[in-house]
């Protein structure tokens, strides 16, 4: 079962800030999180039932460090459309 510890952060990029005007929040999670798991976490911890959830899987970038190849962690990104007038005020919890 999904837990709130699987949510890494709420993304604040130029694109996500433009989407917030339309009631969409972008959330970065661990790769094992599912749409139903995220919906349950949002309902339990934030008291919000999302209208829709879209997800995409992001592969970690390959980077060089001191001449050696390394890879950043993989993650999932969720675009969560919230009902009209609802926000995640206690998102820092």
Swiss-Prot record:
InterPro entries: Nucleotide-bd_a/b_plait_sf, Ribosomal_uL23-like, Ribosomal_uL23/eL15/eS24_sf. One of its GO terms (molecular function) is structural constituent of ribosome. It comes from the Bacteria. Keywords: Ribonucleoprotein, Ribosomal protein, RNA-binding, rRNA-binding. Coiled coil: none annotated. It holds the Pfam family Ribosomal_L23. GO terms for biological process: translation. One of its GO terms (cellular component) is ribonucleoprotein complex. Belongs to the universal ribosomal protein uL23 family. Part of the 50S ribosomal subunit. Contacts protein L29, and trigger factor when it is bound to the ribosome. One of the early assembly proteins it binds 23S rRNA. One of the proteins that surrounds the polypeptide exit tunnel on the outside of the ribosome. Forms the main docking site for trigger factor binding to the ribosome. This is Large ribosomal subunit protein uL23.
């Amino acid at each position: 079962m999904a837990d709130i510890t699987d949510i890494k952060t709420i993304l604040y990029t130029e694109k996500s800030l433009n989407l917030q005007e339309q009631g969409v929040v972008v959330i970065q999670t661990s790769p094992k999180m599912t749409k139903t798991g995220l919906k349950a976490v949002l309902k339990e911890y934030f008291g919000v039932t999302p209208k829709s959830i879209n997800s995409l899987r992001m592969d970690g970038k390959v980077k060089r460090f001191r001449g050696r190849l390394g890879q950043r962690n993989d993650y999932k990104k969720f675009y969560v459309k919230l009902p009209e007038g609802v926000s995640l005020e206690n998102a820092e919890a």
